[in-house]
C-alpha cells in the first residue's frame, strides 16, 4: 500500500503556518465610504474576504445602511478543496478539505467528510455521511459505506494512518481504528469495529471485528461494484 503524500509532521506545519481566516460573504445596502482593498472582492453590493479586512469597510457605510454577514468558519487554517479540476463525481454537501487527493472517476456522496491529507483511489465511492480522517488512504475501486469512519491520524505525529487496499468493501457504519490496514479484496461487514489489520480476500464482522470467512464466488457476486455509477 502506498504512503501518504503528506506525513503527519508536514500537515502539522501546514496548519500551524497557514494564515488563519474567517471568510465571509457580506451583502450590504448603500455606498462604501472607503476604498476596497485588494484582499477583498466586491461584486455589486456583495463583499467576499476575510472578516478582518471586510469589517472596517462596513463601519464606513454611508448613512449606516444595513448589511448581512454569512460565514461558516472562524480562524480556519485549512480551506476547502478546489474541486473544479477534479475528474470525479462529487455530490452537493460533501465536505472536502484542501490537500486531499481524489482519483479519476471516484464518487463522493452527500454528507461525506474528508479531512486533510486523505487519499482516495480511482473508481472508489465514499458513500453518504462517511468520514475519512486525516491521512486516511483508500485504494482503487473500493466502497466506503454510508456512515463508516476511517479514523484519522494527525496527532500524535508518530502514529500510522488507516490504509485500505484496492477492491475493498466497507459496510455502513463500520469503524476502522487508527493505524489499521485493510488488505485488498476484503469485506468489512456493516457495523464492524476493526481494531487489527485485516489480510487480503477475507470477510470480517463483529465488535471487535474477526475473520468469519474467506472471499468466495458468492461473496464477490453480492459485493460487486457498479461501474455505471462511476461514469462521468
Swiss-Prot record:
Q: Which domain of life is it from?
A: Bacteria
Query: Transmembrane stretches, by residue range?
Result: none
**What's a Gene Ontology MF term here?**
tetrahydrodipicolinate N-acetyltransferase activity
| UniProt keywords, alphabetically | Acyltransferase, Amino-acid biosynthesis, Diaminopimelate biosynthesis, Lysine biosynthesis, Repeat, Transferase
Q: Which SUPFAM superfamilies is this protein grouped with?
A: Trimeric LpxA-like enzymes (SSF51161)
Top-rank EC class of the record's enzyme: transferase
Reaction(s) catalysed (UniProt annotation): (S)-2,3,4,5-tetrahydrodipicolinate + acetyl-CoA + H2O = L-2-acetamido-6-oxoheptanedioate + CoA
EC number(s) recorded for this UniProt protein: 2.3.1.89
Q: Name one GO biological process term.
A: lysine biosynthetic process via diaminopimelate
Q: In which pathway does it act?
A: Amino-acid biosynthesis; L-lysine biosynthesis via DAP pathway; LL-2,6-diaminopimelate from (S)-tetrahydrodipicolinate (acetylase route): step 1/3
Please give the family membership noted in the entry: Belongs to the transferase hexapeptide repeat family. DapH subfamily.
NCBIfam families reported for this sequence = DapD_Ac (TIGR03532)
* Role summary: Catalyzes the transfer of an acetyl group from acetyl-CoA to tetrahydrodipicolinate.
Q: What is this protein called?
A: 2,3,4,5-tetrahydropyridine-2,6-dicarboxylate N-acetyltransferase
Organism (species): Streptococcus pneumoniae serotype 2 (strain D39 / NCTC 7466)
Starting at the broadest rank, the lineage of the source organism is: Bacteria, Bacillati, Bacillota, Bacilli, Lactobacillales
Gene that encodes the chain:
dapH
